[in-house]
């Protein structure tokens, strides 16, 4: 009876896990294809649109890697070796770093876009896409430099018996590090994450201040408590602020679960729960952007209309 309940528990987690992957890949594909069509029609993309399309592509890669790792969590065939373990772990970390950097960069560039002409940030408004890509690479290099150890401490499980081992999947484990090395990389990771969250907080706070100032000016000019219709830049700013809030919430939840798992030497099934939480941003952020972006809604309606007419 206990085996049956355990089996049902694993099947339920597996269904949720793969549902998250399928839903996330679907939404990110829609978001990415929309920006591809926009580029083909208009022959240009705003910097923020370019970053969003890159973010969708990064999330597609993250969720694909997550699907491969899920196969070994729920249905291990014991065929994974060190190369597979290290490759998938390194690729997932690389893509997760790019996701964090792109989200941070999106917040910064939206703050620059919203800034008034008198602001010191105005001179950055018309920078080329090459500058934005270079900025992304610089942020990503900083991210990766503070966490390279993780990928190299993952190996295939060759019947290690130590209780201090942490399982990543059924076939892959994280080898324990000595006290000094572990705490050194922990401090570096905290410094890295606080730096990125701090940049997001500063740019988000700046955008909130600009929106509040614009609202007061609009109320003063129109002599009414109702502000006029928001501009596209202001609507985009509110969407990105919502995106930043969701990212920080998921990040804090991921850190809490990760700390709990490390304290209790979590099994692969516990790691799968952490993976579901850590990848929820990649799954739900495109849905948030699709729902709040009028251009995408109109594009989908016209596409569905043509399909029905055909």
From Swiss-Prot:
PROSITE patterns: G_PROTEIN_RECEP_F1_2. GO terms for cellular component: plasma membrane. The chain crosses the membrane at residues 21-41, 47-67, 94-114, 136-156, 184-204, 239-259, 272-292. Keywords: Cell membrane, Disulfide bond, G-protein coupled receptor, Glycoprotein, Membrane, Pheromone response, Receptor, Transducer, Transmembrane, Transmembrane helix. It is a multi-pass membrane protein. The keyword Transmembrane applies. It comes from the Eukaryota. One of its GO terms (biological process) is sensory perception of chemical stimulus. This is Vomeronasal type-1 receptor 90. It comes from Rattus norvegicus (Rat).
């Amino acid at each position: 009876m206990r085996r049956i309940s355990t089996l049902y528990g694993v099947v339920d987690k597996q269904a949720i896990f793969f549902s998250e992957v399928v839903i996330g890949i679907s939404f990110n594909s829609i978001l990415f294809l929309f920006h591809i069509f926009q580029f083909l029609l208009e022959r240009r993309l705003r910097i923020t649109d370019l970053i969003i399309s890159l973010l969708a592509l990064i999330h597609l890669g993250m969720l694909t890697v997550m699907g491969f790792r899920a196969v070994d969590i729920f249905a291990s065939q014991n065929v994974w070796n060190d190369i597979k373990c290290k490759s998938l772990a390194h690729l997932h970390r690389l893509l997760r770093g790019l996701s964090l950097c792109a989200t941070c960069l999106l917040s910064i560039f939206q703050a620059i876009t919203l800034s008034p002409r008198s602001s010191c940030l105005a001179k950055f408004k018309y920078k080329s896409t090459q500058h934005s890509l270079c900025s992304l690479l610089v942020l990503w290099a900083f991210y990766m430099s503070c966490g390279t150890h993780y990928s190299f401490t993952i190996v295939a499980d060759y019947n290690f018996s130590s209780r201090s081992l942490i399982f990543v999947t059924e076939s892959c484990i994280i080898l324990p590090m000595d006290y000094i090395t572990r705490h050194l990389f922990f401090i570096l990771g905290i410094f890295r994450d606080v730096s990125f969250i701090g940049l997001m907080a500063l740019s988000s706070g700046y955008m909130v201040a600009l929106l509040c100032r614009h609202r007061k000016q609009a109320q003063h000019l129109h002599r009414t408590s109702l502000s006029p219709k928001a501009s596209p830049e202001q609507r985009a700013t509110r969407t990105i602020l919502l995106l930043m809030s969701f990212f920080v919430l998921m990040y804090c939840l991921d850190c809490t679960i990760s700390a709990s798992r490390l304290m209790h030497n979590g099994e692969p099934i516990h790691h799968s729960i952490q993976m579901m939480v850590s990848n929820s941003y990649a799954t739900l952020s495109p849905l948030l952007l699709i729902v709040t972006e009028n251009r995408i809604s109109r594009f989908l309606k016209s596409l569905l209309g043509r399909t029905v007419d055909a």
